[in-house]
Amino acid sequence: MTYTFLLFDLDHTLLDFDTAEEVALTQFLQDQGVQDIQAFKDYYKPMNQGLWKDLEQKKISKKDLINSRFAIAFSHFGREVDGEEMALCYQDYIRQQGQSFPGAEDLLAKLVERGYQLYGATNGVTAIQQGRLKQSTITPYFKDIFISEQLGTQKPEVAFYEKISNLIPGFTKEQALMIGDSLTADIAGGNAAGIDNVWYNPDHKENTSPVVPTYVVSDYQELLAILK
């Protein structure tokens, strides 16, 4: 199959969200006077991931997720806060974190050299993602970057891909490839939209879901081997 349009997920695929979150949370919690920062992180991170899964499954809204996660976490440790205010405060920290994985920039440079058109396709908060991308070194390789909050829809919804297809000149599904680490968002969404996909699986996770990717790779070199 010959592809032209490469749709890249960002977090956990190209951008190192775990490092970004670790740095931002530490700074944020220190400034909030939290005593046991590690205990807070140990509670917050899985809780936050669970909320994002709920959002994928349409159990909650993006606004509810953003405005409730810190209220829930602080409440767990006996402190009542304004969740919306804390969310805005945290944004100032996380949006400064543009760490990418080793080899990500080289991967994108080689793909551009090979004639591919690169587009970002990310679920996230616009202000946060735009800030992080501004701090990163990967942004210049993309023709455009589509953020779920801006589109008013998110992966894995078919509408997310339909909106992207209308915004990319000359786009056809047959020439497109979705690349990402999430079976439930990137791969399930690609399948539903009729777009071939690559499951980026660097941790060699077992796929126990009914979602079947077109390709599976564990590192960037394997991806380059597919996209010769």
Placement of each model-derived feature along the sequence:
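Catalytic-core regions built around general acid/base machinery
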Residues: G103-G115
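Generic recognition of short, well-ordered alpha-helical segments
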Residues: T19-V23, P102-D106, G131, V158-A159
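N-terminal helical cap/lid subdomain that shapes the substrate entry/recognition surface
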Residues: T2-P102
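Short glycine/serine/threonine/alanine-rich loop segments
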Residues: R79, Y116, I195
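Asp-based, Mg2+/Mn2+-dependent phosphohydrolase catalytic module
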Residues: M1-L6, A109-V112, V125-K228
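A broad, low-specificity signal for short, low-complexity segments enriched in glycine/proline
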Residues: G33-V34, G78-D82, L107, A159-F160, ...
